[in-house]
Amino acid sequence: MAGRRLARASISAVGVWLLCALGLQATEAELPSAPAELPGGAACLSRFTSGVPSFVLDTEASVSNGATFLGSPTARRGWDCVRSCCTTQNCNLALVELQPDGGEDAISACFLMNCLYEQNFVCKFAPKEGFINYLTQELYRSYRELRTRGFGGSRIPRIWMGIDLKVQLQKPLVLNEADNTDWHLLQGDSDVRVERKRPEEVELWGLKEGTYLFQLTRTDSDQPEETANLTITVLTAKQTEDYCLASYKVGRCRGSFPRWYYDPKEQICKSFTFGGCLGNKNNYLREEECMLACKDVQGISPKRHHPVCSGSCHATQFRCSNGCCIDGFLECDDTPDCPDGSDEATCEKYTSGFDELQNIHFLSDKGYCAELPDTGFCKENIPRWYYNPFSERCARFTYGGCYGNKNNFEEEQQCLESCRGISKKDVFGLRREGSIPTVGSAEVAIAVFLVICIIVVLTILGYCFFKNQRKEFHSPLHHPPPTPASSTVSTTEDTEHLVYNHTTQPL
């Protein structure tokens, strides 16, 4: 009797489980999720933060600072946009525009960006409802560290702070920097020597091709100690081709951003106008960077490499429709390089996507009021005022005389009038982040459905088991005669403080 009851319970449980499995299969068929081992799978999704809502990218300011537009793929949901970011080289920001009345996570547009320029976070944002920003964890940490530093370690030359400085092999490499700064080698050939012959110059001897990581520490008797990291990359001959000998590339997008490129014929850096996307590495924000990377370089533009049609493409390469590989910067340069011409076939998607991103309007034109005060790259001592959105007041800082940002006023009253109404709610990343859609709403429904099915099956089995035990306890004790078919049935059950520093020194 007990065996029959348990068998009936098992059949019922199996029946429920089969119904659940069929329902799950139907749900999965509707909206499949990417496997964890694929580039757009769960391992990729875990690299991103939860979405930062109600802010949109200030495209003009971001690209002017060095951010790069990477594309605008078609996507139905926010997390589809993130998956596209996972499979796009250098993508660290997926910006989505929500679809009005489209349901949870339904979107109308997806934009992919690289918000790093030489390891510095350079994207700017403005408050606007209807948008969500998904950043990689690494990028978000970089942003939080930038905010936490306040003035960003202003007594250490900002031109060197946290960046990857490209240089030619020189004996020695001479850099301008502030006095009282100690250099400590963290990574690279230990034969390198740091010498100081002038108060505001440092000489690096023994550099070889490769990468060096230095920690700069500024110590003053009247100020707290400050540190910053500097990466120096001594370019190889192959890298020099890309950074110095390649012809400058405006790109397909129709923006207008001043940049510098190196002209190896005249051995000087020249200005040009960058369109905003699909550039190459001979593209610098500042003339000083350009000259340091390409000092005294001579030569001609490298020959165009033939497509490689065997093996898989590297991350820096463009994959042609027929499977061949070409250098990534050859995409959309008005010259077909793929045998099938596919590198020039879909360039309009970049143009239209960037135009759409540029045409997103936001009400506030006071985004600079939420920026940290910037002393710039020069070393003058000019008293200025900056606006603090946390206190909603203006405070003094010392401006170095060049570069910097617009949160820079000659008079306190001018500062207050220009930034009236700006508060901490206008600072990107401070508002409560949206829920983490590590899976889409369909995947969430699947998970809930599975849990319910498991609970139902376990409840049926448990109920039948205890009911059977109770009946056996109340029945007379007797031992039925053994039969050859009798057997024993056993069951086993396996079950982030942002600060504004009020003391700044010039660079």
UniProtKB/Swiss-Prot annotation:
Q: Which coarse location class describes where this protein primarily resides?
A: secreted
Q: Which domain of life is it from?
A: Eukaryota
PROSITE patterns under this entry?
BPTI_KUNITZ_1 (PS00280), BPTI_KUNITZ_2 (PS50279), LDLRA_1 (PS01209), LDLRA_2 (PS50068), MANSC (PS50986)
Instruction: Relate the assembly described in the record.
Output: Interacts with HGFAC. Interacts with TMPRSS13; the interaction promotes the phosphorylation and cell membrane localization of TMPRSS13.
A Pfam match: Kunitz_BPTI
Tell me the GO molecular function terms.
Answer: serine-type endopeptidase inhibitor activity
Checking CDD domains in the record gives:
Kunitz_HAI1_1-like, Kunitz_HAI1_2-like, LDLa
**Ranges for domain BPTI/Kunitz inhibitor:** 244-294, 369-419
Name of protein: Kunitz-type protease inhibitor 1
The organism of origin for this protein: Mus musculus
Q: List the disulfide bonds.
A: 244-294, 253-277, 269-290, 320-338, 332-347, 369-419, 378-402, 394-415
